[in-house]
Amino acid sequence: ILNFKRVVFGPRNEYSEKSIVRICQSLLELDNTSEATTFLERLEKSAEAKENLIYAVSNLMKIYYNDKKYNKATLYGEKLTSFNEVDNRIKSDAYLFIARSSKSLGNKKKALNAYKKLENDSNKEFAVEALYFKAMDNFENKEYLNSNLIIEKISSEFSGYKKWTAKSLLLMSKNFYQLGDAFQASFILESVIENFSHMPNIVDSAKNELTKIKLIESEKNSSVEINN
């Protein structure tokens, strides 16, 4: 790194930009994000090659997100989406970080708009996260049937993504309960408990929801058992 720094801090020449990139790469490999940020910002300002500018902006976006500096992460994500001729995978990354950052900042509208760009993304993991957020938004807006339709899509087309499938089924049980179908809601929760034992957090959530339903229903009908 020291040799590259000598080039960077010396008179600008044909090796200056390449040296900054190499420094950034080395610092990121060492997980020295603090110093990497300094050189990435320098690269962003001075880059002549488009791919180096994109490299700088993309990594700054990720660093700021991981540091919970969500406003800056969003800013750099938006810079990426504004560039022409950017690889679709890089743009998808940008929309994902914009969505997650906006969600963390409580800007649900902006998060929804960013997630919408990912609903049909070739990266299935991005797509299923986007669809889940849409289903959750429908639930919060009391659009329970629409939420369930999205969850059915997740279950049928993204069954390999177990975390999102499990979270979606938990949400589906809430939808059914809000629709007045305590039996179906309970059935789904019992299925989650049985089939996702390798996900203790999911199972705990399902058990808690099932207990709540049984307690509420027991007040309506004393024949409903409270205990599992």
Give residue spans per PLM region:
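Acidic, polar-rich low-complexity tracts and alpha-helical solenoid repeat scaffolds
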Residues: 1-228
